[in-house]
From Swiss-Prot:
Major localization class: cytoplasm
Subunit (UniProt): Monomer.
Top EC group: ligase
SMART domains cross-referenced by the UniProt entry: Arg_tRNA_synt_N, DALR_1
GO terms for cellular component: cytoplasm
HAMAP family (alphabetical): Arg_tRNA_synth (MF_00123)
The protein's name: Arginine--tRNA ligase
Species this chain originates from: Acidithiobacillus ferrooxidans (strain ATCC 23270 / DSM 14882 / CIP 104768 / NCIMB 8455)
MF-aspect GO terms: arginine-tRNA ligase activity; ATP binding
Length: 579
């Protein structure tokens, strides 16, 4: 309907321009929805935009525009308000047309082709495979998967990717932690487990599986084991242990390293699949090393004159590209930094021909954005094609009690535990109830409630109520409406028009949610649509004896159910027909 009114407004402006009464037509015509229906269904400020160029009062220009509007079966009347706003009041027929459209387009209602021809790469979650996913990772997973669905619904070609940090120091710390638990099982660990090792029970499980696989084959590395408690610096202590294990185990260090990586990565994959989060590719950081991509990226920066050596380390001159300080690419021991791998990874993303790249990182990585963009500019790439969405933390509550967590200590609620307690639907929905850059309080007790307080239950219940009406119709021997040909002109009540008006908004919300990268707009819309439906359901007798009226009202209800199902699908939430 907005497109129809915009077209009519465009026609009026073209007529005035042809008559020489306005010098030109604005490039974009904004049509807003007034907050109060008394001010119309749509409003335009075009007369105010033209006032300066025309040299006349906006209200007088608005009078000319209204007079030039073509006759329409959908526009009931117009009203000039305030300094020169044009308010449009629509006929019921316009809203009936929306109901027909929903019933015709079905699961495609709300989709558009705004992103046609654009190929986007999205990277999200990408948690280090050093332990199970926890509830904090769940927010990034739900946000990323929902945004991918929304962008696809807007016609974008989306490629989702998980970057596996399998080549860094944290993986070595995990390997060392597994080895210490491997020794501990035989009481062969001479001192307490170090504080900066990975301490979760899952490490013991990995160590037990490793023992089943290799037996005592790795025990020999316990000889000459450095005495970690005697070292005052925990980082130096753990690095000394890692160096000892690499030297003592030789090729078997790869077996130890893989024991943790393979088991945890398999668990992460399974967890995300179970959460409805799917990737086109799992991209290994180690593959960047193996293929020489990191060497090539660093060499390109050196060749362009953007690097220098200081105290044996190779530095990238990031300050020349608006970062707050220069960054190390290669340490004095010859090892590349995580930043060097990240530069290579992003250069490789652009080499694959994506028109746009979206990274979703934890909010604690905000300082990382300038350095990555600086490296892209230094490589001659357009850093504006990289968009970084920072996802704030999710804080877990059980009622009013906050649940504290420590990842390294192994004291955390896993994503799998959350899903098992509240269900996938509640988890997916609650995670996207706020903008990504806002802190999220996740109340476990609320997520399990079967009441109006729980938004996902409230929305799903609206969908189920529609199908309950259909079952009741069959039980009462009442005919159901045909797929098409239902006369909707009989729907004239204000609540029916309001409900159809809410349906009309869905395609707009889909478009703005994609533009703003905000899945929560879909969640908010669905809650409003469900509220409008529940109000209608509770105040209106839908299964009346009169067949034409019953068919029309059921058709309206089915259109509501379809819109709810479409919106929930974008958020990865089911739309049950019975609850």
């Amino acid at each position: 309907m907005k497109a129809f009114v915009s077209q009519a407004l465009q026609g009026a402006l073209q007529q005035l321009h042809a008559q020489g009464r306005i010098p030109g037509i604005p490039a974009t015509l904004e049509l807003d929805r007034p907050k109060q229906v008394e001010h119309g269904h749509l409003a335009s400020n075009v007369a105010l935009l033209l006032a300066k160029a025309v040299g006349r009062k906006p209200r007088d220009i608005a009078d000319d525009i209204v007079a030039a509007l073509p006759a329409s079966d959908w526009i009931a009347r117009t009203e000039i308000a305030g300094p020169g706003f044009i308010n449009f009041f629509l006929q019921p027929a316009a809203f009936h047309a929306v109901i027909h459209r929903v019933r015709t387009e079905k699961e495609h209602f709300g989709a558009n082709r705004n992103g046609a021809g654009q190929r986007l790469q999205m990277e999200f979650v990408s948690a280090n495979p050093t332990g199970p996913l926890h509830v904090g990772h769940g927010r990034g997973a739900a946000y990323g998967a929902s945004l991918a669905n929304i962008l696809r619904f807007n016609g974008f070609d989306i490629f989702c990717e998980y970057y596996v940090n399998d080549a860094g120091r944290q993986m070595d710390i995990l390997a060392a932690s597994v080895y210490l638990r491997y020794l501990e099982a035989d009481k062969a660990l001479p001192w307490p487990f170090p504080e900066n090792g990975y301490r979760g029970d899952y490490v013991r499980e990995i160590a037990a599986h490793l023992r089943e696989q290799v037996g005592d084959r790795l025990r020999h590395a316990a000889v000459g084991l450095p005495n970690l408690p005697q070292m005052s610096d925990g980082d130096i202590a753990i690095d000394t242990l890692i160096a000892h294990l690499k030297q003592s185990l030789g090729e078997d260090y790869r077996t130890l390293h893989s024991a943790g990586l393979d088991e945890i990565l398999a668990d992460i994959r399974d967890d995300l699949e179970g959460f409805g989060v799917h990737y086109e590719r799992w991209y290994s950081e180690g593959s960047l090393m193996d293929t020489g991509a990191v060497d090539s990226a660093v060499a390109a920066l050196e060749k362009a004159g953007h690097c220098y050596t200081q105290e044996g380390a190779l530095w990238f001159r990031a300050t020349a590209f608006d970062d707050d300080k220069d960054r190390v690419l290669r340490r004095d021991n010859g090892a590349y930094t995580y930043f060097a791998s990240d530069v290579a990874y992003h250069a490789e993303k652009f080499a694959r021909g994506f028109t746009h790249v979206i990274d979703m990182w934890g909010a604690d990585h905000h300082g990382y954005v300038p350095r990555v963009k600086a490296a892209l500019r230094a490589l001659g790439l357009d850093d504006q094609q990289l968009e970084v969405v920072l996802v704030q933390f999710a804080i877990l509550y059980r009622g009013t009690e906050k649940i504290s967590m420590s990842t390294r200590a192994g004291e955390f609620v896993t994503l799998r535990e959350l899903r098992e307690e509240v269900g996938n639907d509640a988890a997916r929905f609650f995670y996207v109830l706020r903008r990504a850059d806002q802190h999220l309080d996740f109340d476990l007790e609320l997520a399990k409630k079967h009441s109006e307080e729980n938004p996902v239950f409230y929305i799903q219940y609206a969908h189920a109520r529609v199908y309950s009406l259909l079952r009741q119709s069959v039980e009462k021997g009442l005919s159901l409406p045909p797929a098409d040909g239902v006369g909707l002109e009989i729907l004239q009540e204000s609540r029916e028009i309001a409900l159809a008006d809410a349906l009309w908004r869905f395609p707009e919300v889909v478009a703005t949610a994609a533009r703003d990268r905000e899945p929560h707009q879909i969640a908010f819309y669905l809650r409003e649509l469900a509220a409008a439906f529940h109000t209608y359901y509770n105040s209106t007798r839908i299964l009346v004896e009169e067949t034409p009226l019953r068919h029309a009202r059921l058709t309206l209800c089915l259109a509501v159910a379809q819109s709810i199902a479409n919106g929930l699908r974008l958020l990865g939430v089911s739309a049950p027909e019975q609850m």
